[in-house]
From Swiss-Prot:
Protein name: Small cysteine and glycine repeat-containing protein 7
Region (14 X 2 AA repeats of CG): 4-80
GO terms for cellular component: intermediate filament
Name of the gene encoding the protein in the UniProt record: SCYGR7
Organism: Homo sapiens
Annotated disulfide bonds: none
Amino acid sequence: MGCCGCGSCGGCGGGCGGCGGGCGGGCGGGCGSCTTCRCYRVGCCSSCCPCCRGCCGGCCSTPVICCCRRTCGSCGCGCGKGCCQQKGCCQKQCCC
């Protein structure tokens, strides 16, 4: 289950439709060292989930440094449709 009370959102497609205010106001505590982040909006993700800090859209399904934009394709340094898998990739801005 994810943190911020968004674990019941279902899939990651289309953002976090069912969470609404749950992500907006409920991100203060209780997230701890989250190991799985799913369906978080960018604000919730960046302020609450250490494993997703620096997201630029979409969601994080594994503890990664940066989520790529939905339009991001493979850029040859750890990026794919979902997330950037390497810190250096995000820093080089080859996807995000």
